[in-house]
């Protein structure tokens, strides 16, 4: 994805905003809260690739979806519509918006597409509607939409705990990633019910991650046994590096020091695989777009 800031097409009042994908560089489950939500630890890595959200402000207060970003998802269930309505209600905003999504991030792959799209709508409409809500407030609203939304609102690579909302910014080295979408989706609640899932990992520290001792994803063994397509991707990627799972899957990735190395690895994969080479971002391009509105 180009690192676009705010981009206005000539002769229109539409604006385009980036919604970057993410990777979980590791993920472990350390317990469960009294309300049933699982506690986890992970590192979120933002990428320079993702969706684009197109927005046009309306004066009549209506929130409308233009096109169908996710086939089969009703407008009222679409996270971008829910995000806009939530912000409108929380801020008492009179304005509305038309929303169109250019999807690149595979749905249900653990790359954060839905959460990132929702975060971009919150951040962008906060600017376009002139609301001036703080990042803390937007992150709190985002948490009502999903545990991953706050990290996209804040726009920084982060060590995450709790249900994923307790974020500590973390500096990560430059890296390129070979991503593969196996094309299968298992709902996260189904995976959480699996008897094979490790739910009591010993809590780790950021220093453990920095030492390179944390690479595993708790969902990986469950998915590899359950889904032949995921196992096949792991086998293919193991020929070019150390494959890992992102989120609760089914997206897989291998990290490389350079884009050239990742491109070379991509050339060795079967042409039938849906794969991309992307780079890690030091911060979200959404922050650049937001800051451009202040100039």
From Swiss-Prot:
EC id: 2.7.1.148
Protein name: 4-diphosphocytidyl-2-C-methyl-D-erythritol kinase
Listed pathway(s): Isoprenoid biosynthesis; isopentenyl diphosphate biosynthesis via DXP pathway; isopentenyl diphosphate from 1-deoxy-D-xylulose 5-phosphate: step 3/6
Organism encoding this protein: Xanthomonas oryzae pv. oryzae (strain KACC10331 / KXO85)
Record GO terms (molecular function): 4-(cytidine 5'-diphospho)-2-C-methyl-D-erythritol kinase activity; ATP binding
Role: Catalyzes the phosphorylation of the position 2 hydroxy group of 4-diphosphocytidyl-2C-methyl-D-erythritol.
Catalytic activity: 4-CDP-2-C-methyl-D-erythritol + ATP = 4-CDP-2-C-methyl-D-erythritol 2-phosphate + ADP + H(+)
Gene field: ispE
Root EC class: transferase
Keywords: ATP-binding, Isoprene biosynthesis, Kinase, Nucleotide-binding, Transferase
UniProt KW Kinase keyword: yes
List of catalytic residues: 22, 148
Family: Belongs to the GHMP kinase family. IspE subfamily.
Residues holding ATP: 106-116
A GO biological-process term: isopentenyl diphosphate biosynthetic process, methylerythritol 4-phosphate pathway
